[in-house]
Amino acid sequence: MATPSLDSARAADAAIEKAPDLLPEALPGRRPSLVGLTRDALKAQLIGMGVPERESRMRAGQVWHWVNFRGASDFAEMTNVGKALKAQLAEHFTLERPEVASRQVSRDGTRKWLLRMAPTNRQEHNRGAEIECVYIPGPDRGTLCVSSQVGCTLTCSFCHTGTQRLVRNLSAAEIVQQLVTARDELGDWPGQMPSRDAGGSGEVGRLVTNIVFMGMGEPLYNLDAVVDAVGVMSDQEGLGLSRRRITVSTSGVVPQIPRLGEQANAMLAISLHAVRDDLRDELVPLNRKYPIAELLAACRAYPGLSNARRITFEYVMLKGVNDSDADARELVRLLKGIPAKINLIPFNPWPGSRYECSDWDRIERFSEIVFNAGYASPVRTPRGRDILAACGQLKSETEKLRARARLMQEEGIGVESFYAGADD
């Protein structure tokens, strides 16, 4: 396999260093949404609106219940809130969710939503940034894969999202709104009729039982928002998910790993994908900054690590690249002493990717070596491949359209009609 050029390596390193603190700001004159706010932020908004501070905790608790437990989409639904206060709330705020710009359902039942966030500046032609969110139904759980950034800086060579430039971080509210929108789409609120064929099963009848931060972006480059979002999602008087059912996946931003454990108390997943630094430098350029030894040292010190709170190591199976018996044995050696599970991920192809998925018998042999060494080594069943919703395939539809338009321009093909029909 070709080694990346010096220029591309430098570009990747520059992208890693960037990690910009880009957060959305509401357009002037636009009423903010209360959906997804933390308790403290909600209380502050009500006080700012004029609710007396001595009443603010009670009023915030009422609104919290309707927004995060009942899934209210209109202030009129809040039956235990006085008429005057409801009118005041409606004057100052909304209960808007992101716009669902498109819906796709895979043959296997996986659902992918393209979500358009509220516009944050006029340079975006009044179209908010777009992210993808995926729901994966299973026999004993329903997993929602959420995004933490619009695009990504990391340029991992096997990942489609890495080909989309970073636009900005998502706010904590925008991360939570992905769960709220999924529950809207699935009919997953108390008293609602679940969407037909939504699949899933689990505690208190919820369709969405698990959250994985494995969508667009590197969560630990937006850790403040991720910590707040986990807090809102796991509040037992609201959205009610267990923190043990919330997993945050990182490519290895080593300095932030302890804080994730201390403040979010979420389960940790590591996108490892290689057992040698030279190969991981190519697959996951962040490795040049935080090599494997440093990453695994941080894993061994992860707060709360135990056999009951294992770290998941994700390992994408690339034909002829990282799938040999020797790779499997070295993986076992590296992880010695870390309570861990190794998820083997068949590579999911995407347009323009230069890798192939390992043959199935090679994946099974790799799994057998790891399993015989005492580690659970499930092979992740590819879900949603036909709608580009599988691991490593996410990239917002608008970005795909722009890329296609650039190609058309380079080839001398007019793009005016192309963009005109993009929203049809």
From Swiss-Prot:
What would you give as a GO molecular function for this chain, any one?
Answer: rRNA (adenine(2503)-C2-)-methyltransferase activity
Question: Does this UniProt record's set of keywords contain Coiled coil?
Answer: no
- SUPFAM superfamilies according to UniProt: Radical SAM enzymes
Q: Which Pfam families match?
A: Radical_SAM (PF04055), RlmN_N (PF21016)
Record EC number: 2.1.1.192
Active site located where? Answer: E132 (proton acceptor), C391 (s-methylcysteine intermediate)
Where does it sit, as one GO cellular component term?
A: cytoplasm
Q: Which reaction does it catalyse?
A: adenosine(2503) in 23S rRNA + 2 reduced [2Fe-2S]-[ferredoxin] + 2 S-adenosyl-L-methionine = 2-methyladenosine(2503) in 23S rRNA + 5'-deoxyadenosine + L-methionine + 2 oxidized [2Fe-2S]-[ferredoxin] + S-adenosyl-L-homocysteine; adenosine(37) in tRNA + 2 reduced [2Fe-2S]-[ferredoxin] + 2 S-adenosyl-L-methionine = 2-methyladenosine(37) in tRNA + 5'-deoxyadenosine + L-methionine + 2 oxidized [2Fe-2S]-[ferredoxin] + S-adenosyl-L-homocysteine
For this chain, the annotated S-S bridges are: C145-C391
Cofactor binding note from Swiss-Prot or TrEMBL: Binds 1 [4Fe-4S] cluster. The cluster is coordinated with 3 cysteines and an exchangeable S-adenosyl-L-methionine.
Residues annotated as domain Radical SAM core = 138-388
Q: Does the keyword Iron-sulfur apply?
A: yes
What is known about what this protein does?
A: Specifically methylates position 2 of adenine 2503 in 23S rRNA and position 2 of adenine 37 in tRNAs. m2A2503 modification seems to play a crucial role in the proofreading step occurring at the peptidyl transferase center and thus would serve to optimize ribosomal fidelity.
Q: What else is known?
A: Reaction proceeds by a ping-pong mechanism involving intermediate methylation of a conserved cysteine residue.
- Protein name listed in UniProt: Dual-specificity RNA methyltransferase RlmN
Q: What is the source species?
A: Methylobacterium radiotolerans (strain ATCC 27329 / DSM 1819 / JCM 2831 / NBRC 15690 / NCIMB 10815 / 0-1)
What gene name is given for the protein in this entry? rlmN
